[in-house]
Amino acid sequence: MKKIKLLLCVLLAVVLLAVGCGGQGGQGGEAPAGLPEGFVYLAEAVPDVILEIRYYSSYNFLGTRVDDYLVPVAIISSEAAAALAVAEANLRAQGYVVKVFDAYRPQGAVDHFVRWAEDHGDVLTKAYFYPDLAKDRLFPEGYIAERSGHSRGSTIDLTIVDMQTGKELDMGTPFDFFGTASHHGSDLVDAEQTANRLILRAAMEGAGFVAYEEEWWHYTLAGEPYPDTYFDFVVR
């Protein structure tokens, strides 16, 4: 176990060096064109991840493409990208690949979420994403808020895919399911689904991320570089 932890630490150091020196926006390097300093395109920093950017599509709880997602890419802080590379390597060694649903999220997109939540007549996606909640409860119960940690640039929504079957592991709920079944430790999911969540959690926490207890897919880098800054540049 100590050897594994040492190898992961070495890998993290190597990735941090590569990100910083490779023009990926880390300290000492220029950001990719169009990105603020300190941010990278995830597909360039961690090439083996699968991207399924839900807010660029209509396959999300709004039922439409979200404002300010102009292209289906994932943007993230350099530090979070380096840490994710460590988690990805850990999971790949176990036969899994990372699939990312969202990373950096513009404040303009969060504002779109708020407008949608305030339109109580729009319940197009209720049956799939929030079947047990009235829409007017999404704000009071904290599922929608006027600010998101994603806008600080070091939070990521993801799952894992079995490399042999090409299928996502069964986590018990879809991504962005509003309900207690999405919580870590929920008794509404079975033992296999709980075990699958723990595979993801162990890899992410081992790489320096912190789990959000109410969403199995949501992780934030501990010691994130911009803890008090909410960015609003578009995803392009």
Residue ranges and their predicted role:
Residues 1-8:
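Bacterial N-terminal signal peptides that target proteins for export
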Residues 12-13:
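Core hydrophobic alpha-helical membrane-spanning segments
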Residues 17-20:
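C-terminal motif of bacterial Sec signal peptides marking the signal peptidase cleavage site
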Residues 22-103, 107-214, 223-236:
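Extracytoplasmic cell-surface/polysaccharide-interacting catalytic and binding patches
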Residues 219:
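Conserved metal-phosphate-binding beta-hairpin within the catalytic cores
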